């Protein structure tokens, strides 16, 4: 009985230590997600303004550009996958990788070749374990979006979409990341980044035009200097970089939200285990006391 009580005490002590770790990680994720959400919300106006400007030029000046023209036949696609560097985030990375597998299967069924780029150690480990090929990977700070990382990813994507097909160029660029909707809802998403889909700027119901009525009412009166073509060529790389940065912000916020929920659930489970082991330890102690009393009474009666 004494040995059994010691076992339960050890389990209670180890579970209590793990509970402290879970609580600390939950608090860290909670504190960092506020900063990540602010970065995500701050990226919206800039990206939406660039979208409106690009649409304004393309629709009103009839500008044709290779990055806005869908080829007659898409033969090769670039797929960039955003996962996490670390675990302990629930099913965050596995959901993205599952969506990636579905996308790659769809591309194969359509006869398209896929060039895969991985962001996050989880994606790299997944492909390495299955001996799957990928073109390049980036790791580090997946839960902290940065403009430097967005610039690096954008340069690679712009290089591939602009390169000739015989040199490994691609016809379209697809992003697979987790869209942050709320603290409890995050959904894997596939976004076709390039070629751009240009819509009529006057029909765009984006956040910027909703906040600033003058932009919506007088959008058609904009003039672009020195000329619309040069402005359009300058806007496109900035637009792509803004969209990549937005995907990084969504992924970082989703990762932190998933980790916060996972650590809270782990802490709650640890609390239940501590209660269970405490109850079993008390039962074992009561059984030991009962046995000792029975032995004492039996010995007294024998005398």
From Swiss-Prot:
<dbReference type="GO" id="GO:0046933">
    <property type="term" value="F:proton-transporting ATP synthase activity, rotational mechanism"/>
</dbReference>
<keyword id="KW-0472">Membrane</keyword>
<keyword id="KW-0375">Hydrogen ion transport</keyword>
<dbReference type="GO" id="GO:0005524">
    <property type="term" value="F:ATP binding"/>
</dbReference>
<comment type="function">
    <text>Produces ATP from ADP in the presence of a proton gradient across the membrane. The gamma chain is believed to be important in regulating ATPase activity and the flow of protons through the CF(0) complex.</text>
</comment>
<keyword id="KW-0139">CF(1)</keyword>
<dbReference type="Pfam" id="PF00231">
    <property type="entry name" value="ATP-synt"/>
</dbReference>
<keyword id="KW-0066">ATP synthesis</keyword>
<comment type="subunit">
    <text>F-type ATPases have 2 components, CF(1) - the catalytic core - and CF(0) - the membrane proton channel. CF(1) has five subunits: alpha(3), beta(3), gamma(1), delta(1), epsilon(1). CF(0) has three main subunits: a, b and c.</text>
</comment>
<dbReference type="InterPro" id="IPR023632">
    <property type="entry name" value="ATP_synth_F1_gsu_CS"/>
</dbReference>
<dbReference type="GO" id="GO:0005886">
    <property type="term" value="C:plasma membrane"/>
</dbReference>
<protein>
    <recommendedName>
        <fullName>ATP synthase gamma chain</fullName>
    </recommendedName>
</protein>
<dbReference type="InterPro" id="IPR000131">
    <property type="entry name" value="ATP_synth_F1_gsu"/>
</dbReference>
<dbReference type="InterPro" id="IPR035968">
    <property type="entry name" value="ATP_synth_F1_ATPase_gsu"/>
</dbReference>
<keyword id="KW-1003">Cell membrane</keyword>
<comment type="similarity">
    <text>Belongs to the ATPase gamma chain family.</text>
</comment>
<dbReference type="GO" id="GO:0045259">
    <property type="term" value="C:proton-transporting ATP synthase complex"/>
</dbReference>
<keyword id="KW-0813">Transport</keyword>
<keyword id="KW-0406">Ion transport</keyword>
<dbReference type="GO" id="GO:0042777">
    <property type="term" value="P:proton motive force-driven plasma membrane ATP synthesis"/>
</dbReference>
